[in-house]
From Swiss-Prot:
Entry annotated with the keyword Cytoplasm: yes
Function as written in the Swiss-Prot or TrEMBL entry: Binds to DNA and alters its conformation. May be involved in regulation of gene expression, nucleoid organization and DNA protection.
GO molecular function annotations of the record: DNA binding
Assembly with partners or alone: Homodimer.
Keyword match Cytoplasm: yes
Major subcellular location class: cytoplasm
InterPro entries: YbaB-like_sf, YbaB/EbfC
CC annotations in GO: bacterial nucleoid; cytosol
Superkingdom classification of source: Bacteria
Protein name per UniProt: Nucleoid-associated protein RPD_0086
Sorted UniProt keywords: Cytoplasm, DNA-binding
Length: 106
């Protein structure tokens, strides 16, 4: 019975730490870029896009296809960085628990 109570206490502590981590992830902002910085996407570590910056040279009618490609690439770059930041926070939180990877706790 004591083991069960200990596990319940650990679960409650983990839940509290998860809430705090979610707040931290919301404060972390990463930036992805493409085209040598012509397009930049800012994103939180919770994968929420916070802003997009586009160099004026790309805002020409004949640059539409290039701009689309650069936006996709910049978003992908920001997403990778946000995912890495989230994984780092998750590792710090769950590192000693021996949980299997890929549980989607973030």
């Amino acid at each position: 019975m004591a083991d069960f109570l200990g596990m319940m206490k650990q679960a409650a502590q983990l839940q509290s730490k998860m809430k705090a981590m979610q707040a931290e992830l919301d404060q972390i902002e990463v930036e992805g870029s493409s085209g040598g910085g012509l397009v930049q996407v800012r994103m939180s570590a919770k994968m929420e896009v916070r802003g997009v910056s586009i160099d004026p040279s790309l805002l020409k009618p004949d640059e539409g296809g290039v701009l689309e490609d650069l936006l996709v690439a910049a978003h992908a770059d920001a997403h990778r960085k946000a995912e890495a930041a989230m994984q780092e926070k998750m590792q710090a939180l769950t590192g000693g628990l021996g949980l299997p990877p890929g549980l989607g706790l973030g």
